[in-house]
Structures are given as C-alpha cells and as structure tokens.
Amino acid sequence: MAIDPIKLSQELISFPSITPTDNGAIDFLSNTLSQYGFTCHVLTFGDDQVQVRNLYAQLGNGSPNLCFAGHTDVVPTGDSEKWKFDPFSGKIEDNILYGRGVVDMKSAICAFVAAVSRIDFNQINGSISFLISGDEEGNYFKYGTPAVLKWLTDNNKKIDFCLVGEPTSQSSVGDTIKIGRRGSINFKIVCNGVQGHVAYPHLAENPVDNMISILYKISNTVLDNGNEYFQPSNCEITSVDVGNTATNVIPDKITANLNIRYNDMHTSESLFNIINNICAEITEKYELFTAVSGSSFITHPGKHSDMLSSAIKKVTGQDAILSTSGGTSDARFIKDFCPVIELGLSNETAHKINEHAPVDDIYKLTDIYEEFIRQFFNIS
C-alpha cells in the first residue's frame, strides 16, 4: 500500500531530533522501511561526548544501487513562543505544513519513502537504498554520513548513484537541481607585535597596521571570474579581534578570521598559498591556520541529471536549472563514493521560525521522485 508523504512527514516531524539527538526518528524510519522489505542497519558512531545514530536501509542486492541520502537531525527551534504552532506538532493550516525540519529535510525523506512505496519492487532490476544521517546540521557530522560511508566500504556495499534531498528549489519545487557545491575553507590570521603605551609608539610594535594591510590586499584580490557551472569564488572577512579594552595600550596581537567559498578552479592548497603569500609580503610576524569544511566538486551533466530534469518537466512542466550555488551539504562526502546530485523542497524557510512547506509541494516532490525512480530503473 502506498504511503501518504504528508502523514509520514507529520509523524517524522513529531520527533524532536535537534542535532545531534535522535529521540526516536531513526528507529521510526527504520521500522517504516522494514515494513516494505528493506534490510535496515541502525548504525551508531561517536565518542565519549556524543553518540550519533544513523540508518542505512537497502531493498535488493543487485546493481545499480540507487541511494537516497538525507538527515533526520534538525537545527534548534529558537524561541518556540514565536512559532505559530508547536515546532514539532506537524500542524497543517491553509494547506501548509509547519514544523522544524519540514523543509530541511524531513519531508523530502518522506517524499522519497512514499515514492518508493508506489513502485512494484518486482520490476526493479537493481536495488534502492537510504543513507540517513543523524548529524548533518551540527558539530559531530563526522559521525554521520562520513562514518556510514566508511561502514559501507568496510562491508563491501556499493552505491552507484545518490540523490540527496536537501532543499535546493528556489521559487517553485523542481526549479533547481544542485549538480555540485562550492568548497569552504576558513582562515585564521594572527599578526604579532610588541605591546606598549600609545604615547611611546617607538617602544612598541603595533600589529594592527600589518593586519590592515593584509586584509586590504586580500579584499582586493580577485580569486577568479567563475566558469560555466560556478560563480566566482568569494572571500569574506568574518571577524577582527585584538582583545584589548584599554584605549591607551598598543596590543601585542591581532587575529582575523575569514572564509572563502571557492569553485573548482581552486583547491584548499592553492588558496592557502594565495593567502600565505599575501601575509608574507606584509610581515614575517604572522601565523596562519586553516580548516577545510569541504572541497568544491561537480557531477557533470549527464544521464542522471537528464533523467531528473525530465521527471521535473513531466510533473511540473518547467525546465530545471543546474546549479552549484549555496552552502555545503553531505554531498561533499558522498561525491568521493559515487556520482551525486541534489533535489528537494524550496529553501526559503529552512532554519527559520515557522519553517513550512505547502502540502502540494510535498506531493509534487513525491511525484518527481517517483518518476525519477521509474526512469532510473526503466519501469513503465
């Protein structure tokens, strides 16, 4: 019997799975998929601080293996008093479903589950799977999708193609398919000097001067002009701190943080060299630290993006845009495992108070997913 994606969404939303807690969401999905013949593995990874629960479920053992990836964890609700309804009530008003995680991304998971439930499994020449992370939004994401992918490798399980249900749509469901993502790298620059009294600058060395010169040059450096699939890389200064509350003291240190969102014309190493060379031109008294959140990648347009575009056209009548804009997602890990593209609901209210999606959009997304599955396995 086919599943109603709205009812399933309401049930999944009712679990307050604020990252990295689970509160029953993974078990609920596992039990639901088990009823449709999926072999489910609830996988827990973590350390002394946290235990993250994930799910890998598979129907069939053959190739190709079409995998849907998503996450059940959600960001905090903020002030729940400002919500129209209880954030975990899954309330519907005026044909709009409200709740934390509706958009990002519980309803997309439910839409794909519902789409699968409409398929005659006997017609599938291959297998369908779900990779569901319990921590995509928080600080323990390494115990989510990356850990599950390692488990798949260790257990000789192969995914041939992955569709991620992140909210990619802009104005209407299906108008945007993500075929790649920009990389993200954080820099911390520390300039050192000599502390002293502002009245005796010759006895001190103000590191602020060097930092101003460094940041000015970085801000005026054009990293690239973009290319066919990516917008230009951009660098944003996010903080500048001296930790000095006294107005008559020259500080001995200044720290600046910046983030670069970069396209496939760069690597984290090439960007480090650019920033490091700028710092070295200005002063020898600096330290440079980096943290890479994810590398840029692209799944070049081909049969899978064509299938998804065709499914969108059939259901909605619109032509989808292929995009690489926006932030990072777990696709940055999956791309090392298999080809991956992303399609989900509109991202307009993701992470916001009164997060919501029209009921019709969820049904429409379910129809798109179903049509994509049929095309993928050549099912009439």
From Swiss-Prot:
Record's catalysed reaction(s): N-succinyl-(2S,6S)-2,6-diaminopimelate + H2O = (2S,6S)-2,6-diaminopimelate + succinate
One GO molecular-function entry: zinc ion binding
InterPro entries assigned: Bact_exopeptidase_dim_dom (IPR036264), DapE_proteobac (IPR005941), Peptidase_M20 (IPR002933), Peptidase_M20_dimer (IPR011650), Peptidase_M20A (IPR050072)
One GO BP annotation of this record: diaminopimelate biosynthetic process
Cofactor: how and how many bound: Binds 2 Zn(2+) or Co(2+) ions per subunit.
Ligand binding (Zn(2+) 1): 71, 104, 166
Residues holding Zn(2+) 2: 104, 137, 351
PANTHER family tied to this protein: ACETYLORNITHINE DEACETYLASE (PTHR43808), N-ACETYL-L-CITRULLINE DEACETYLASE (PTHR43808:SF31)
Function: Catalyzes the hydrolysis of N-succinyl-L,L-diaminopimelic acid (SDAP), forming succinate and LL-2,6-diaminopimelate (DAP), an intermediate involved in the bacterial biosynthesis of lysine and meso-diaminopimelic acid, an essential component of bacterial cell walls.
Protein name, per record: Succinyl-diaminopimelate desuccinylase
